[in-house]
């Protein structure tokens, strides 16, 4: 009797749940990621690398921020340089510039996203300033653990080597904690915090530099050739296998000394085929693992320092190393030396560290041919898909300055069809005094998402058919019927097709519904093209007939 009662309850509950699901329209989705435009999407503007008084005066800057806000920018991101905040000595902090910047942001009624920039400014693409990291830092150790050394022996000091985790734990921890205390009075204007994870603020090795002859579009140079790095790799290998004899068995080698366990002696050959060997797989796992551990460490330090005071998301950046991607001779020959061998595993570290991820090059297109073998769009799609699968909040940037509408449209395609929660425009000077570019940005990317219900009645579907909509803007798939159409769902209660769709408020849109058969072919289109001019700022519904 008890079992019969439980069975009846389960049946009744199932019927009720089914009935409720039919009454409530489901969130519609783009075919690629199952989410459509992110309802939390916001646009950000990247501040100049130099201090504001070196570029303009504070009053003009505040007016610029008001203008940016009117054009759809929610917040301004800004680098606060370690080499400026603690240049005079260990724990001799000066946050006066950060506080003055925050005051101007507050005066303008805007938000800011501070970047705790523990790397140098200067020497990377687009840099127009020169702020090295504090000189006293290099006295913290007497060995070579604090800096990088490449295959060719080039020493790089633009940021601390993540292998120096003891120094990083102390110095970054102190910096983060002091920053939180100094900026507490301005917590209301801080929307998010970004952490520098390496060169140019990106979680990577300094594997492509002009000083090392590895600028774009060359292959990268590995950066594990200090004596400290060699010893760390050796220790990792011996811990994994237990003895030199077991190492030789696994690698198929005949090493006669533990000292012979070394990084690749020939980076070119390694990238051609050495990476396929067990030795190569181990080396790349260790090499990327250093970045993963660094991600977890700075995430831990940041959450400990910032969560209580600011209670905002914290993020870090992965670089868009898009060249040599599909080189048939050295595939991914720029990514591997940067520390990017397994993006899925790297993103797991972001997830573990509770960090949002920012990725670059949203404005670029694939070329995939000699000599660049550049595939930025494919790379963006791969990273975005992985981040969405793992539930990691995803933000984007352009890699180079944008100078035309077409590049904005490419950004919109990626941002609105791959669930980006935000896009940061690089950089302030490019749009602030260019009304044409600012207007294009506002229309295409400076948008406010709003959930609207789309209803289509009298659709002549048969069993196995599905109804989609597509339209004239990136948020609607730009008339695409394969990758980006937004799926509607059949409502048996109302006998129509409907769904909740995130749309750009106060923008004019045009769209049509169409039917796809079970095999994916387009059967027919809605007769009359629909217009919504403009999309309301408040949630409502749009109903049309087939």
Swiss-Prot record:
Enzyme class: hydrolase
Domain CBM20: 444-546
Top-rank taxon: Bacteria
Protein's GO biological process: polysaccharide catabolic process
Signal peptide from the UniProt entry: 1-30
Substitution effect: residue 194 to Q: Reduces activity by 80%
Location of the active site: 202 (proton donor), 397 (proton acceptor)
EC number(s) reported in the record: 3.2.1.2
Catalytic activity: Hydrolysis of (1->4)-alpha-D-glucosidic linkages in polysaccharides so as to remove successive maltose units from the non-reducing ends of the chains
Keywords linked to the UniProt accession: Calcium, Carbohydrate metabolism, Disulfide bond, Glycosidase, Hydrolase, Metal-binding, Polysaccharide degradation, Signal
Similarity field: Belongs to the glycosyl hydrolase 14 family.
Name by which UniProt lists this protein: Beta-amylase
